[in-house]
């Protein structure tokens, strides 16, 4: 039987989105390694990273390498942070959930030193080198999404995709030959089965006989497919992405500054998730039959380790005695990642209980740990910066950053669909940062800052919809069907700095960051029709998601020794 997907709100290019094999990557893998937050020294974070034209700060140098040319002496900086992360979800204004945890680490270390004598009046040139490590992004958080009577189930989504593939059940149930890993897991785990009279059309296994005493109890005309009474998604994420910079730069006549950076990153990420749906069917009283009770569980575990390499270039110029302007470019980052993952599916109904009357799984299907390696190109970005002096009492700074998230690319396999999704559905992401530093008295500084980034979502299909209902078919990452779409990130910060003794300084900052996101338990899908008859063999579905905000409150401290 040949089939085609009837595309309703979906793009034609998403024909096979979501139909993934066990080792498939998805746009979520690219986006996860592109996520940002306020980072670096306490001085920079106190100004919300609006430091591209500031210079003479290790994080300012990471934004614009030309800033290294302002250094006249050597310095070593250590940075620490401790914070609280809280994720809150709201499903259809009916069901909410909060989860939180404490985090903290050594998040910055740098050394910078001139390699030419900055005090030689016979030369207008200065050359400076430096190296730094910064925690670029922390993944640590837990979140939970609860739904009440969602319109569609995960089993319906998987049945739709298995039908679109059109693989006979003898092929689908064989892990070694199946073209659809999640469908194989679901078929062997009791989530889906073949529709009566077909061997390649699939339906959910969560159904009940309308008349339990009918001669053909499970004839299609006597079966009702159940909708979930409730859904619950639990996710725990851990890990971080760190950045290592090796910079050389300098200045000419204290008017023009230049620099270049070799940049590497390392990433360690771990994720565990469980999505459960509960079903219930009440028979008519005259049947005197026990009610039908089901629940299904899809569990996934994923760990990823890898890194990238790239470069950064910057220029900066003094504008008289008024301030400075600068521009910098980060090249695309090229990376390689290794992952280990496993999946478990369990299907329960009240035909099996233990001695305590608790439901036990009637079907269980799980995998051993599986491994995979893939390559990834992350987008480059451009930053324009400006700084204006406030007499001798401080400065105001502004940074504008632009990058094209749609230029990210998965490599090392057949990622045509995923890369097409990235190209068509992600686009320009813009970040605005503004900072203030004032010096009321010598040796003491007050700082404040604000930053805002949009989510870089281009397609209407993945942009916010009324009620957080999404019919769009984004790509599931293997058996991980849930995904988070970020709409914005903003931070507000305040800080102080003071001279402790000699040329040693202490900087402190408070940073409040908020990520506004939407979380979905599975994608939407278009209906599937038999090409020859035009009969709908799998209905289209939508996914009902929840609004989620992740708020991080952090205290940052940096200690700098100059010599």
Please tell me what each predicted stretch does.
Residues 1-28:
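Bacterial Sec-dependent N-terminal signal peptides
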Residues 16-17, 69, 76, 519:
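Hydrophobic alpha-helical membrane context
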Residues 25-39, 44, 114-563:
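Outer-membrane beta-barrel porins/channels
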Residues 42, 54-63, 69-150, 242:
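Outer-membrane beta-barrel translocator/receptor signature
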